[in-house]
Curated annotation (Swiss-Prot):
UniProt entry keywords in alphabetical sequence: ATP-binding, GTP-binding, Nucleotide-binding
Classification lineage: Bacteria, Pseudomonadati, Pseudomonadota, Gammaproteobacteria, Pasteurellales
GO MF terms held by the record: ATP binding; GTP binding; molecular adaptor activity
Similarity comment: family membership: Belongs to the RapZ-like family.
NCBIfam families in the record: PRK05416.1
PANTHER family per record: RNASE ADAPTER PROTEIN RAPZ (PTHR30448:SF0)
Lineage: superkingdom: Bacteria
Protein task: Displays ATPase and GTPase activities.
Transmembrane segments: none
Binding site for ATP: 8-15
Protein name in the entry: Nucleotide-binding protein HI_1146
HAMAP family, per the entry: RapZ_like (MF_00636)
Binding site for GTP: 56-59
Signal peptide: none
Length: 285
């Protein structure tokens, strides 16, 4: 039986994810204690082939050993995939303020901020077992559902999806990144008044960066690094590889380099999505 376990930070979108899986034909169970999972899956395996189970902080054991033991028991008999949903602290605080709901750990007389931090400490052992970590900070409900559908299709196709994204360090490092490359040491078009209003997608900025040997050398060496390890990553039964390229504001250097890397792997026949987080963020403002 295929089992998808949905977990993550409270407010990161577990309910939305579970509904998306239900729409995809999964038999869904919301919030069952982890210790009861082996018994539940034994019962469900008699009538179901695909099950999605949501776990929140209240149903995860404090002991990392107990967690590992339970997951190991399940993996002996079933196909287990764990999806962990993340969002940055400010977004979680805003979502709770908007919904006016209590955080599960607020019952321990903790402030919302303290409850969010405490929860993350509890969840850290589970993150180590996740097959997919999704940062929902900038994802709409529709986009989250689509990413999950892509993940499920990836399970059946056994094909690694590569996401190459640019970002600005001043907005924070993407939480779902597998690799983060810092390009702030490269020549910066920002200091040229004619290039400053443009982005790394525009020809004058691309020409400026392409004219510098160190930029081309960085792109070459980064391609070589990823090319070297990509076959092993593809064999590792994962669905996504997220490569994040960061500069100060996420407008020039990181955008150009992410675009170059993404197009390189597309030309090699890989399934690649290129996204520019800071550019998309600034469009919404």
């Amino acid at each position: 039986m295929e089992i998808i376990i949905i977990s993550g930070r409270s407010g990161a979108g577990k309910s939305v994810a579970l509904r998306a899986l239900e729409d995809a034909g999964y038999y869904c169970v919301d919030n069952i204690p982890l210790d009861l999972l082996p018994q539940l899956t034994d019962i469900l395996s008699q009538s179901q082939s695909s099950v999605a189970i949501s776990l929140d902080i209240r149903n995860i054991p404090n002991s990392a050993h107990s967690l590992k033991q339970t997951l190991s028991t399940l993996q002996k008999h079933h196909q287990i995939k764990i999806i962990f949903l993340e969002a940055d602290r400010a977004t979680l605080i805003r979502r709770y303020s908007d919904s006016r709901r209590l955080h599960p750990l607020s019952l321990k007389d903790l402030s919302l901020e303290a409850a969010i931090d405490e929860e993350y400490r509890y969840l850290e052992p589970l993150i180590q077992h996740a097959n997919l970590i999704l940062d929902t900070t900038h994802l709409s409900t529709h986009s989250l559902a689509e990413r999950l559908r892509e993940f499920l299709r990836g399970n059946s196709e056994k094909e690694l999806k590569i996401i190459v994204e640019s970002f600005g360090f001043k907005y924070g490092i993407p939480l779902d990144a597998d690799y983060v490359f810092d390009v702030r040491f490269l020549p910066n078009p920002h200091w040229d008044p004619t290039l400053r209003p443009m982005t790394g997608l525009e020809a004058p900025v691309a020409e400026f960066l392409n004219s510098h040997t160190e930029v081309n050398e960085f792109i070459y060496l980064t391609r070589h690094y990823i090319d070297t390890w990509l076959p092993m990553l593809e064999k590792n039964n994962r669905s996504y590889l997220t490569i994040a390229i960061g500069c100060t504001g996420g407008k020039h250097r990181s955008v150009y380099i992410a675009q170059q890397l993404g197009e390189y792997f597309q030309a090699k026949g890989k399934t690649v999505k290129i996204q520019h987080k800071s550019l998309e963020r600034n469009k919404k403002i």
